Amino acid sequence: MKVNFTKMQGSGNDFVVIDATKTPFQLTTSQIQKMANRRFGVGFDQLLVIEPPKNNSVDFHFRIFNADGSEVGQCGNGARCIARFIRAHQLSDREELRVSTLNEVLELKIQPDGKVSVKMGVPRFEPTEIPFIASGVANFYDIAVDNQIVKLGVVNIGNPHAIIPVERINAEEVGKLGARLSVHECFPEGANVGFMQVIDPQNIRLRVYERGTGETLACGSNACAAVAVGRRCGLLQERVVVSQPGGSLTIDWQGPLTPVTMTGPATTVFCGEWLD
């Protein structure tokens, strides 16, 4: 099998993008895992597959696969790369695009400076919508993990997210606690786990352990989740700059019942062929 692909990155979150708008495309879980391997494959955090629209209300559909082959419903950094790919490959001349994923519809717009803005949808805090096992709705929950109690906020923005407020981000804790929480029994579908350090009401630092992938240099949807959780409990303002190891994103959220908007860069790294 020969697969033409484009390698892209958004804030260091890297992707393999495949155009399946004209020819149907399918990989098995084992093939995705092989392609994701950074020593024996191409290497990526997520695989993005662009497909024709499922209905007339959107311009394209795109599928998102983690490095372990699991399909997920949201990827903010990937959405920005999709917008740049569609423009570069002349798949559409629209200034604004609507694209569907497994469970969301996103609105994409390339800004004059080349950055891409994505309307990520309305944050959902009800435990049953995340899903998260809890007796009621709260700003923060106390979760038992091994021999400690962890305070976290939860929200769904296309994917389940757990946000842990910390005074200072500890790299070892991100790897160990993040891995444990990403598959915790309180999250029936797993979760992306963000460690949020509030610098001031307009700036936070964030590191993320993604389910099915591990720690990444950036996670757009978790950046949105962190701002939503921080705004909900009065820690943050409407516009927040989120600094992650791979770069910074600007997140805007006016409040309940309104969508979160994320703005940041997206870059093509190289094009190639994968032979299996």
Curated annotation (Swiss-Prot):
Major enzyme class: isomerase
UniProt keyword annotations, A-Z: Amino-acid biosynthesis, Cytoplasm, Isomerase, Lysine biosynthesis
Gene Ontology annotations for the cellular component aspect, listed alphabetically: cytosol
Active-site feature positions: 75 (proton donor), 219 (proton acceptor)
Keyword Amino-acid biosynthesis: yes
Function: Catalyzes the stereoinversion of LL-2,6-diaminopimelate (L,L-DAP) to meso-diaminopimelate (meso-DAP), a precursor of L-lysine and an essential component of the bacterial peptidoglycan.
GO MF, one example: diaminopimelate epimerase activity
Site feature: Important for dimerization: 270
Annotated protein name in UniProt: Diaminopimelate epimerase
HAMAP family hit by this protein: DAP_epimerase (MF_00197)
Subunit organization: Homodimer.
Pathway(s) it belongs to: Amino-acid biosynthesis; L-lysine biosynthesis via DAP pathway; DL-2,6-diaminopimelate from LL-2,6-diaminopimelate: step 1/1
Reactions mediated catalytically: (2S,6S)-2,6-diaminopimelate = meso-2,6-diaminopimelate
Site, Could be important to modulate the pK values of the two catalytic cysteine residues: residue positions: 161, 210
InterPro entries, sorted: DAP_epimerase_AS, DAP_epimerase_DapF
Binding site residues for substrate: 13, 46, 66, 76-77, 159, 192, 210-211, 220-221
Organism in which the protein naturally occurs: Coxiella burnetii (strain RSA 493 / Nine Mile phase I)
Keyword Isomerase among UniProt keywords: yes
Record GO biological process: lysine biosynthetic process via diaminopimelate
Listed Pfam families: DAP_epimerase (PF01678)
EC number, UniProt record: 5.1.1.7
Compartment list: Cytoplasm
Family indicated by similarity: Belongs to the diaminopimelate epimerase family.
